[in-house]
């Protein structure tokens, strides 16, 4: 019985230890957080990657009429 179990374990070890092909690079999909399920906030919806993002706020130098600073 012991010899049978040891033989079975040896066969399993040989099958598991078989060489496996590996890649030398990481795919872009593994790095891109927006491509996976449940993307974080701020990711564009699928199909809009090439479009320019819409600005959230208009650009402002920090000057207003109240401050009387030079305006463009």
UniProtKB/Swiss-Prot annotation:
GO terms for biological process: calcium-mediated signaling; cell-cell signaling; regulation of growth. The keyword Lipoprotein does not apply. Residues 1-17 form the signal peptide. It comes from the Eukaryota. Keywords: Disulfide bond, Hormone, Secreted, Signal. Residues 37-60 are annotated as: Disordered. GO terms for molecular function: hormone activity. Disulfide bonds join 34-43, 63-69. It is found in: Secreted. GO terms for cellular component: apoplast. PANTHER family: PROTEIN RALF-LIKE 10-RELATED, PROTEIN RALF-LIKE 15-RELATED. Cell signaling peptide that may regulate plant stress, growth, and development. Mediates a rapid alkalinization of extracellular space by mediating a transient increase in the cytoplasmic Ca(2+) concentration leading to a calcium-dependent signaling events through a cell surface receptor and a concomitant activation of some intracellular mitogen-activated protein kinases. Belongs to the plant rapid alkalinization factor (RALF) family. This is Protein RALF-like 12. It comes from Arabidopsis thaliana. The gene is RALFL12.
């Amino acid at each position: 019985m012991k010899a049978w179990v040891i033989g079975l374990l040896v066969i399993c070890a040989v099958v598991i230890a078989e060489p496996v092909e590996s890649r030398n690079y990481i795919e872009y999909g593994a790095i891109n957080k927006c491509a996976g399920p449940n993307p974080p906030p701020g990711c564009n919806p699928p199909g809009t990657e090439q479009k320019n993002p819409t600005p959230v706020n208009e650009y402002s130098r920090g000057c207003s009429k109240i401050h009387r600073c030079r305006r463009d």
